[in-house]
Amino acid sequence: ENFMQGIYDKINYIAYSATTQEELCYGEKGVYEEGYFSRERELKRQMVRLFNSFYVDDLQIYAKNGKDYYFSVKQEVKKPEKEEIAKMIQQATDAMGGIVCINDLKHSGHLQIVKEVRDNLKMSPIGTIRLSINSDALEQIRKNVNFASEGAVLILDEKNQIVQGQASELS
């Protein structure tokens, strides 16, 4: 629980930061700002600082203005298809700014976390953040839980399907 809360806090930090807000509101598609102190470069540095973890495989921010910001910890990360991304963005939109966890372990091997970013002043949607956590990280979290007696940890998705752990541990 602490791990996921930490991830949620980082996502919220990026979503509400002044740099993200300005870039998602005023950035222009097809325009790359080269200056070290440009909003785009500052946003990318912020993404690297907050998510350089072996738990996180990639982080992507989709702006309503058409710009796309991507950061990956690994070289060979399988990015979701456009249809999957559209579905995730719709789920984030339906949550109206809330954080949504999507079980995508069977397809991509990741737990996808999405959040709709809203303008701090107008509360209108300006983009979506997508973060993927690899299944190895979930297994490591599950194994690190220690009980004083017999016990096991299962990680379930929103439909109570087992994400990590064995069904035999339920008995």
PLM region descriptions:
Residues 31-42:
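Signal-transducing coiled-coil linker helices
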Residues 1-28:
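Juxtamembrane extracytoplasmic/periplasmic/luminal helical "stalk" adjacent to the first N-terminal
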Residues 40-51, 55, 122-170:
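Solvent-exposed, extracytoplasmic
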Residues 22-24, 62, 67-74, 160-167:
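Amphipathic coiled-coil signal-relay and dimerization helices
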Residues 28-33, 75-78:
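Short glycine-enriched, charge-decorated loop/helix-capping segments at active-site entrances
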Residues 80-84, 142, 171:
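A short, polar/proline- and glycine-enriched secondary-structure boundary/capping micro-motif
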Residues 16, 59-66, 152-161:
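Short hydrophobic alpha-helical segments used for membrane anchoring or interfacial signaling
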Residues 52-132:
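Extracytoplasmic/periplasmic ligand-binding sensor regions of membrane-associated signaling proteins
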